[in-house]
């Protein structure tokens, strides 16, 4: 039996929606197209932001903050870039509300120029960069630089338009985490991103048990919170809800908490804890001495982090095929043969604008060019030109 129905294999799209629902990550909001990110989902997002913020600052970058609104004229400067999502933009046309005769409210104070609620940041950042002497991952070439007049002085003292990139992330990373690590029992969270590393589940049959067990759980939580892990300390939650029938345990399995500790009177008497790890089958549990568990919690979490990472790498390797023939490439993405699913394709590639139409017909695009190249010369699948550059191709969904 599994906690999530349907399973990944039965209906991937519905499985994904059920994981979000059962993990209580988010829900729809009254505003169409918007969602409410709930505590677990937002805890994940906060940890992702903090981790990436450290990585960005390690490269010497600094943070800035830009307005939510973009003047329509800014958007129009780079029409090609916004074409894909222009129809999804919200537009602000008035600056206030006023009372209507007979009750209710109506917009008033029409703006001289409509404002776009920005779906992306390049246009407004580009306009500011033009005045400075000095964010997905895209090579934008000189498109935004020309539109926003961003120039620099080269070694010869001549002015040139800047070559710009855009890189950053959104809450879509949470979706990637679900798809990469989730299973048929729900969400699986790598420890370094988990809002809580350990959840303690007190088990008590009567009031006398409750007092003893809760005192033990509070002491255990305090000891665990003093242990270092990652950039901080172990984060612990005690779930003291009065639930029976395994419902409390399964709620945390579906929520992906890395470690579950079930603590009852027998554990107190034995000075032990009963441990369940989210990187292992839900039914698999082990008993550890109290002191041993506390002292080794950091090592256990690091082991889980490593196992999940290696599992993800193995999954990627399993779904990546090296292809050097155009016919095989087309079969890979046609999906007409059993066992051919169209995952990642690693192929020799020469960047040529004329290739775009060929890829569009297959609904495939270049996803990235790996830093580590095979240093093997082969013919580009699309131009036939010899090259030692290899690229990763895939479909975007």
Q: How would you describe each model-predicted region?
A:
Residues 1-397:
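NTP/phosphate- and nucleic-acid-binding module
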